[in-house]
Amino acid sequence: MRNIFFKTAVCLITAIISFSLSASQREWKDAPGGLPYYKYTGSSDADPSFLIGNSHIKVKTHLDGIYEMISGERCWARFNADPVRPDYGKNRATVYLNKKRINLVGPGSLATVPGKCEVYSGAGFVRYDYDLGNGIKCSRMISVMPSQTPADTAPLFLVTLTFENTGSAARNLSYDEALSPYFVQASHQLIHEAERPLRYNMSTDISFRCIKASFGPVPQDFVPLAVPQNRAKDEFAPQSIFLYSANAFLVVNEGELKASIEDFKVRARKKHTFHIVIGFSGDDNKGLAEAVIKKAEDSQFGAFSSMWKKHLPDFSAEKNKDVRNELYRSAYSIEASMVYSDYFKETFIPGKFLYASRFGENISNSDHINAALQACYTNPSLAKSIIRYVMKQTSFDGIIPDSNKGFGYISSDQYTHNLTQLEVLNVLAEYLMRTGDYEFLDEWLTVYPMERGEVQSVKSIIERYFIYIRDKAYVSATMSSMQAAVLPKFLDQMKKSGKLSAEFIDAFQKYTDKAVEHFNSRNEYASADIQYLLESKLLTNSQKRDILDEAMNKGSVDMRAIPGLSSFDGIEASSLFRTLILKNDASDDADIMDAWTIYSYFRIKE
């Protein structure tokens, strides 16, 4: 049984991974006075996904209207998972018109019928526009608010239903919005339910206008139970979820949390709108839901479109519409994928959201820290949180693990030799250059494992990075290129800060001089290291030109080359940037290259 399930799951995952939402499947438009959005124009046979979210909730919606309610705040998990289909959810939206039941979402629903449904997506929203027949139009829109701060935001989404009667006679309708709570940890979704280490019993509680569903872990094998705030591979304290509606009759029926709005009338040439809130449970679900509904805008481009416009970087000065659309898409994708870690108490940007949400592993700290480069320009508090997130995972000897999984769990084999320390120093230097926040160097951080409560100063962590880099027995060509670009830049910021000891500055200066001497002694430079070579102040423009030409001939130039290229040839950097961004065919799921795109844009502007 397990083998059959696993093979089926792998086939489904492979099919989903192979599909990406290309530029040709988007018809971009500009909302009046707002942000760009697009209409999906691809085949209904495909299964693209549209990610909306903030640091506390992810809603991955499918073309057929099914959504996955996802969180990475603790273990990456789905809270309305389909029991038999990985990477899919279980929810229902049903209209009753003229005694006829019309399913709006799911396989075989109206959402999959050509000509009966159009799908639009933009910053913070996905909208499905239906033609129900008999002169009745229906819009079902899912919206999320942006994160107010990296750690603070509303962990919920708003479902806005609008029925419009274009006919000459009033119509009576009924509507159900429901989801089926079923908790599945991402790392377990390819394991048959009977063979997972834990299963989860659901319990529900109905109060005024709210239904709450909670999940209790039940071991199915020998699994030492963990304290909820202690690191663990498996989830022992899943978040609870809730559904709120001021207009509906709420009921738990056959495992569904259901909001039913029965027999309402839509008069001729009139509209009828109502809201349903679904999210992660807190101290006052009703109060939070009502506060969010009050902030909802009467806009078909997202219930919080004005908030998103204010929150995202302003790219309106970009004259090339296609480039501008991609900039907004990349910036929004970063915001939609970033996640607050309850274990580390910091927010980070997953380098690969698809991987994290599918397999439950945050890969990799190298990607996470590089994603902070763009945040130095767009959201310095987020950049700082990412730096802290990576620093908190550092071992006593200065090694940074490649990744973590579960609830803050880092296995011993993740502490491998890598070059992430140099990347942290690079981002820290960039952050200090942009903000002048030298007081950050005096801060103390609680370090891994967090439950022990051990604190270390940022300065001591920096010193351990330096010792680790200095004492490496072998310096590769890539490491040499990185050192030439990073060490002088970082040393300059440490001197300006006045926070590090004279002994440290002297030792760092000596090592930097040695690294520069080693770099200058090289006769060849690998085009694979182009992002560091172009950033280095030790090469002439002529040398950089040769390196760039070689890399372009090999087809190995991507967005990571742009920041360094901008330092010696701004016109070419701008041209190459626009060429690369228009080749971007990535899906809406945020990727590290989205972060490099935004960072490159701001570097070019300097």
Placement of each model-derived feature along the sequence:
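Polysaccharide-binding surfaces and accessory modules of carbohydrate-active proteins
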Residues: 86, 143-253, 298-307
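Beta-strand-rich N-terminal accessory domains
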Residues: 23-91
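Beta-strand-rich recognition/accessory modules
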Residues: 232-303
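Active-site core of glycosidic bond-cleaving carbohydrate-active enzymes
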Residues: 364-379, 459, 478-496, 506, ...
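Low-complexity, Ser/Thr/Pro/Gly-enriched N-terminal "stalk/linker" regions
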Residues: 24, 301-359, 385, 389
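Bacterial N-terminal signal peptides
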Residues: 9-18
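Extended, loop-rich substrate-binding clefts of extracytoplasmic carbohydrate-active enzymes
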Residues: 98-156, 245-260, 332
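Aromatic-rich carbohydrate-recognition surfaces in CAZymes
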Residues: 361-480, 573-576, 580-584, 593-606
